[in-house]
Amino acid sequence: MLNLISCELSKLKRSKMVLISVAGVLSTPLLMLIEALQTHFDKPEIIFTLSDIYSDSVLYIMLLVNMMIYVAIAAYLYSREYTENTLKTILPIPISRTKLLIGKFCTLLLWIVMLTLVTWAGIFIVCGLYHVVFTLEGYSLLVAISWLPKFLFGGILMFLTTSPFVFIAFKTKGFVAPVIASAVIVMGSVALSNQELGALYPWTATFFLIDGRIESTGYPLALAIGIIILVSAVGFFMTFHHFKKEDLK
């Protein structure tokens, strides 16, 4: 299994997709910097802290920018075997399809964790630049570190909810369909981000869970978590079932 993950990572070293994904998630820190500058000049009486910026960034990470990028890298990671026609050379080697999929899912998780860390560090760095020029209340590494577990947990939740898009990537053998599907899902997430029903929509429920808003919706926490797990499990099952039954021509 470690050899499979190592092989997947070595293939990514030669891919421009890694740099593209890093550049993509860095748009979140830049958006937070722009928002901070706008607040500073338009409403100078408002005092905000580093913790406030991290809190506001959760919306962009869980519902908008990062979620779409994570779906894109998931689609790329799985569809590339079809576009590059490498499955026929991989599967004759004594590697089961199940192990191959598990290796890819582990690689996807590592990639998402890496991008989540880049986002977290990027916010701290751009806030540092703001702090040097304007002074930011509560700017310290300890505050940033206190947000790291929440960011990583959010990354894991987003990894779980990418499984249906992985199935779409396998089913269509392409990159475009899962990305289009993610755009539709993101629009739904944004529409429900201020609605109580968002607790029942798995891609919004992950945001509510990280933001601590599940209880305020009136729905049980266990129900929201159960929906997230159910959608994730269905996505994983359909992916494994389809790939194991697929006839490679």
Curated annotation (Swiss-Prot):
Q: What happens when the gene is disrupted?
A: Disruption mutant is sensitive to bacitracin.
Subcellular localization(s) per the UniProt record: Cell membrane
Induction section of the entry: Transcription is activated by the regulatory protein BcrR in the presence of bacitracin.
Q: Name one GO cellular component term.
A: plasma membrane
Membrane topology is:
Multi-pass membrane protein
Q: Has the keyword Transport been applied to this entry?
A: yes
Keyword entries, A-Z? Antibiotic resistance, Cell membrane, Membrane, Plasmid, Transmembrane, Transmembrane helix, Transport
The highest taxon in the source lineage is Bacteria
Residue ranges spanning the membrane: these are 17-37, 58-78, 108-128, 141-161, 174-194, 220-240
Which terms under GO biological process does the entry name?
response to antibiotic
Major localization class: membrane
The record's subunit annotation is: The complex is probably composed of two ATP-binding proteins (BcrA) and two transmembrane proteins (BcrB).
Q: What does this protein do?
A: Essential for high-level bacitracin resistance. Part of the ABC transporter complex BcrAB. Probably responsible for the translocation of the substrate across the membrane.
- Record-given protein name: Bacitracin transport permease protein BcrB
Can you name the source organism?
A: Enterococcus faecalis (Streptococcus faecalis)
UniProt gene name: bcrB
